[in-house]
Design a protein with these regions (language model features):
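Helix-rich C-terminal or lid/interface subdomains of diverse kinases
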Residues: 42, 129-133, 235-241, 246-317
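ATP-binding pocket architecture of kinase catalytic cores
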Residues: 9-11, 34-165, 179
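A short, highly charged nucleic-acid-interacting micro-segment common to nuclease
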Residues: 6-16
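An alpha-helical support segment within catalytic cores of ATP-dependent transferases
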Residues: 14-33, 98-102, 109, 125, ...
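Short glycine/proline-enriched coil/turn segments at helix->beta-strand junctions
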Residues: 33, 51-55, 250-253, 266
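Active-site acidic catalytic loop and adjacent metal/ATP-binding pocket
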Residues: 44-51, 57, 194-243
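Short, surface-exposed alpha-helical segments at coil->helix boundaries
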Residues: 18-22, 73, 254, 258
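Short beta-strand segments
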Residues: 58-60, 94-95, 154, 208-211, ...
Length: 317
């Protein structure tokens, strides 16, 4: 999630019937004698299905989404080999075009399913002694990939925190939303947000970044409690490495986030932690506002604020 809510962004300009999903699955993966197709959910851009818990199919919700899938195909051609040594998998996305007889208008994304459950959402007993160094190593190698390897992909360059794009301008709306709860525990959040100023552009070396490393995009092994994969790279950009740390405190807290920073082993400028704190605080409040525009279930977003701000917001649950 890299920008604020609008109904149009969640809309779909085509129909998708389950019969079409079956036809496309049979075309995309021939010789499927027996199979089970499961609907996994829908996001900004795609309706997502799995086949036998072995393959992922992503169906664009709008024509404009095709360019996002094409971007992921290009990015994955660099990421898959570069990150193989980390033991953290990334989707090896390919595009396939359904035959005209199926009646689905767009190409779809397909890739081998990465095992694991979404971090911070499904309750998992974490193995921090494995998760922390493995995640730090993943981020270190990711941010060490030479940016010229992405030069032909026309990625955006961001000298400010891209995760806050669209939210900075909505500061007054976010403040009004926080006031609406009339919960004293949120006063510290309101006071900080009311007085904070936008960060100056980052002047250091830019890296390739995931740029939306929210908990749902990190997969963890439910049995062993460690990271298995990172998905949804459509917001990938050349930017400030801090961007990929901002959402870690949402679900692992500050102590474990700082332990990842300590194990990261790439040079950090003297404002790294300041930008990390600013981004985490602002984005946690923005996520609450954003989700409230379309859902009454704000339990995850409230939990994020509790972890980032170290508050008890049980009155909101």
């Amino acid at each position: 999630m890299s920008s604020s809510y609008s109904p149009e962004r969640w809309s779909s300009d085509r129909d998708l019937r389950f019969g079409q999903v079956i036809q496309i699955a049979e075309e995309a993966i021939p010789n499927l004698k027996q199979y089970e197709i499961s609907y996994l959910g829908s996001g900004w851009c795609n309706d997502v299905y799995s086949i036998n818990n072995n393959w992922i199919l992503r169906f664009p919700r709008r024509e404009e989404v095709i360019t996002h899938l094409q971007k992921e195909v290009s990015i994955s051609s660099v990421l898959v080999p570069a990150l193989e040594e980390t033991g953290v998998l990334v989707p090896d996305v390919k595009l396939t075009t359904p035959s005209p007889s199926v009646g689905f208008p767009y190409p779809i994304g397909i890739y081998p399913m990465i095992k694991g459950v979404s971090a911070g959402i499904d309750p998992v007993e974490m193995n921090w002694t494995d998760f922390i160094p493995k995640t730090a190593n993943f981020l270190r190698i990711l941010h060490s990939i030479p940016v010229d390897q992405f030069k032909d992909f026309h990625l955006p360059t961001q000298e400010t925190l891209g995760c806050l794009e669209g939210f900075i301008e909505m500061k007054e709306d976010i403040l009004s939303h926080l006031h609406s709860y009339e919960v004293k525990s949120l006063d510290v959040c309101v006071e900080w947000l009311d007085s904070c100023e936008p960060l100056p552009p980052f002047s250091g070396d830019l890296s390739f970044i995931h740029n939306d490393l929210a908990p749902e995009h990190i997969l963890v092994d439910p049995e062993f409690g460690t990271i298995t994969g990172v998905i949804d790279w459509e917001d990938g950009a050349i930017g400030d490495p801090v961007s990929d740390f901002v959402t870690l405190p949402f679900w692992i807290g500050w102590e474990n986030t700082f332990r990842i920073c300590d194990s990261y082993s790439l040079p950090m400028d003297d404002k790294f932690l300041c930008r990390l704190e600013y981004g985490s605080k602002f984005l946690s409040l923005a996520y609450l506002y954003d989700e409230a525009q379309r859902s009454n279930d704000l339990s995850s977003q409230i939990s994020f604020i509790e972890n980032v701000w170290e508050l008890d917001l049980s009155l909101l649950k």
